[in-house]
C-alpha cells in the first residue's frame, strides 16, 4: 500500500480553507506529504493588531474545524474587540433588532490566520510563489502538474502531485481546469470598506450607535455595516446594490427575471462603479446629498458616514469593488480525478449569511477525514489512484450539499437585505 508520505498533495492557496487543511494534515498521526503555494508574503504576527474584518465561527462548521485542528484552547484565549451583539436599524434609525447571541464567537481574520499558521510547519508553505498553471491528472501516471514561480525568481518550476487541492479563492486557477465548472458572476452588489479610528475615544455617540458588535442598516438598495475591530476602531462597509440607481431599478422591473434563481444577467457593476468618486471629499458629497444614496437617511446614520469619510486621509483613494458569487445553478461541478476544491474556489458566495469561511473550514475538515480513511487502509484489489478517487468522491458527496444549502441561504439573505422592507425582514430572520 502507498504510504501517506509517498503521495504528494498540493494545496493552492493559504487562506482559511488552505491553512485549515494544512493544520489538519499536520495534526494527523499519518505523515502527509503536502505543500502549500501562496502568492502573498507570510503575514507578520503583528498584523493581529491591524484593523480587519471579523468572523463568527459557528458550531458544526468553523468551530468544529478549529477543534479538530487541536487549536480550540488557543482559540478561547484570543480576545476579540467585537462582541456577539447584533443590531439592525432601518434607514430612519429605528432599532428593529438588538441582541447578544451565543455560540458564535468572533475572531478577526488576521487572528485566525495566525492561529492556523501556528500549527503548520514553516517549510510546508511556499510564500511569494505564484501558481502559473495547473494540469489535470495524467491517465498513465495518475498525477497532475503544478507550475509555479517565486516572485523573485526568473524561471518557473513544474512539479507533479497525486492530489491538487484548489483553495485559491474566487478566481481559482484550479477551478478553471474543470471544464464544467462555472466562473463567478456579478451579484449585483458593490462594496466600499472604510475604517473609523478612535471610535471609543472621540466619538461617543457613534460608539453607542454601533454597539459592542455589529450594526446593520438597510434601505433603498443599500446596506451599511459597522463592526468593531481592534484598538477602538470600527470597520464601516457600504454595500450598494446596482438597483439603487433608478435606471437600473426600472430595467430590472421590466426584465421579468426571477430573482430566486440568481442574479439578473443585465446587471453590470461598471454602471455603478463609474459613478462613485475615489476622493473622500467627493464621495462624501455624493453619498450624503444624492437621493440615490444616503441623503434621505436619518441624521445619526449620515453623521456616521460623514465622520468616517472625514477620517480618511485627504489623499486616500477609496475604491469600490464588485462582489461576485458562483451561480446557484449549475452546481455542483463535474467530478475530476486528482483535483478537488475547498472554500471560495468551490462555492464562492457573498457574506450575507456569514457562511463563507465557516463552510470553507468545514470543507477542509471533511476532506481531511476522507484522506485519513485513505491512510488507514483500502481494499487490496483497488489501486491507490482509484482509492484516492473514491475518497474524493466521498468528500464531494458531503461537501457539495452543504455548500449548496449555504449558497441558497446567502442568496436569500441578499435578496431580503435589498427588498423594500429589508431591515424588517432581516430583523425577523434574526429573531427567529
UniProtKB/Swiss-Prot annotation:
Keyword annotations from UniProtKB, A to Z: FAD, Flavoprotein, Glycoprotein, Membrane, Monooxygenase, Oxidoreductase, Transmembrane, Transmembrane helix
InterPro entries, alphabetized: FAD-bd, FAD/NAD-bd_sf
Membrane topology: Single-pass membrane protein
A GO cellular-component term linked to this record: membrane
Residues with attached carbohydrate: 33
Gene3D superfamilies in the record: FAD/NAD(P)-binding domain (3.50.50.60)
Keyword Ribonucleoprotein set for record: no
EC number: 1.-.-.-
Claim: Transport is one of the keywords in the record: no
Broad EC category: oxidoreductase
Record's subcellular location: Membrane
Highest rank taxon of the organism: Eukaryota
Family statement drawn from the similarity comment of this UniProt entry: Belongs to the aromatic-ring hydroxylase family.
Physiological role: Monooxygenase; part of the gene cluster that mediates the biosynthesis of penigequinolones, potent insecticidal alkaloids that contain a highly modified 10-carbon prenyl group. The first stage is catalyzed by the nonribosomal peptide synthetase penN that condenses anthranilic acid and O-methyl-L-tyrosine to produce 4'-methoxycyclopeptin. 4'-methoxycyclopeptin is then converted to 4'-methoxydehydrocyclopeptin by the ketoglutarate-dependent dioxygenase penM through dehydrogenation to form a double bond between C-alpha and C-beta of the O-methyltyrosine side chain.
Name of the protein in its database record: Monooxygenase penA
Gene designation per UniProt: penA
Amino acid at each position: 500500500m502507498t504510504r501517506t508520505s509517498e503521495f504528494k498533495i498540493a494545496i493552492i492557496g493559504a487562506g482559511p480553507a488552505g491553512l485549515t487543511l494544512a493544520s489538519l494534515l499536520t495534526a494527523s498521526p499519518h505523515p502527509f506529504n503536502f505543500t502549500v503555494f501562496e502568492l502573498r508574503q507570510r503575514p507578520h504576527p503583528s498584523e493581529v493588531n491591524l484593523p480587519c474584518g471579523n468572523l463568527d465561527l459557528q458550531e458544526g462548521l468553523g468551530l468544529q474545524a478549529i477543534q479538530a485542528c487541536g487549536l480550540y484552547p488557543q482559540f478561547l484565549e484570543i480576545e476579540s474587540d467585537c462582541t456577539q451583539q447584533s443590531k439592525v436599524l432601518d434607514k430612519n434609525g429605528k432599532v428593529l433588532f438588538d441582541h447578544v447571541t451565543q455560540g458564535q464567537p468572533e475572531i478577526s481574520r488576521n487572528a485566525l490566520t495566525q492561529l492556523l499558521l501556528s500549527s503548520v510547519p514553516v517549510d510546508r508553505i511556499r510564500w511569494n510563489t505564484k501558481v502559473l498553471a495547473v494540469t489535470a491528472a495524467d491517465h498513465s501516471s495518475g498525477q497532475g502538474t503544478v507550475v509555479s514561480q517565486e516572485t523573485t525568481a526568473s524561471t518557473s518550476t513544474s512539479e507533479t502531485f497525486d492530489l491538487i487541492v484548489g483553495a485559491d479563492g474566487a478566481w481559482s486557477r484550479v477551478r478553471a481546469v474543470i471544464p464544467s465548472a462555472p466562473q463567478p458572476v456579478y451579484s449585483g452588489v458593490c462594496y466600499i470598506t472604510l475604517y473609523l479610528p478612535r471610535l471609543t475615544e472621540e466619538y461617543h455617540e457613534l460608539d453607542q450607535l454601533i454597539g459592542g458588535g455589529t450594526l446593520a442598516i438597510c434601505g433603498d438598495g443599500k446596506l451599511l455595516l459597522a463592526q468593531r475591530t481592534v484598538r477602538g476602531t470600527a470597520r464601516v462597509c457600504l454595500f450598494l446594490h446596482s438597483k439603487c440607481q433608478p435606471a437600473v431599478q426600472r430595467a430590472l422591473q421590466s426584465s421579468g427575471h426571477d430573482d430566486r434563481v440568481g442574479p439578473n444577467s443585465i446587471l453590470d457593476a461598471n454602471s455603478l462603479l463609474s459613478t462613485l468618486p475615489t476622493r473622500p471629499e467627493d464621495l462624501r458629497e455624493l453619498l450624503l446629498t444624492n437621493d440615490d444614496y444616503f441623503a434621505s437617511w436619518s441624521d445619526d446614520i449620515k453623521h456616521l458616514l460623514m465622520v468616517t469619510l472625514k477620517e480618511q486621509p485627504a489623499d486616500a483613494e477609496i475604491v469600490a469593488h464588485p462582489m461576485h458569487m458562483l451561480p446557484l445553478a449549475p452546481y455542483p461541478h463535474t467530478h475530476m480525478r486528482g483535483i478537488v476544491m475547498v472554500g471560495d474556489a468551490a462555492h464562492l458566495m457573498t457574506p450575507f449569511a456569514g457562511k463563507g469561511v465557516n463552510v470553507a473550514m468545514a470543507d477542509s475538515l471533511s476532506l481531511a477525514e476522507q484522506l485519513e480513511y485513505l491512510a488507514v487502509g483500502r481494499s487490496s484489489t483497488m489501486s491507490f489512484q482509484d482509492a484516492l478517487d473514491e475518497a474524493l468522491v466521498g468528500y464531494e458527496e458531503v461537501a457539495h450539499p452543504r455548500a449548496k444549502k449555504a449558497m441558497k441561504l446567502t442568496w436569500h439573505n441578499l435578496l431580503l437585505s435589498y427588498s423594500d422592507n429589508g431591515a424588517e425582514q432581516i430583523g425577523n430572520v434574526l429573531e427567529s
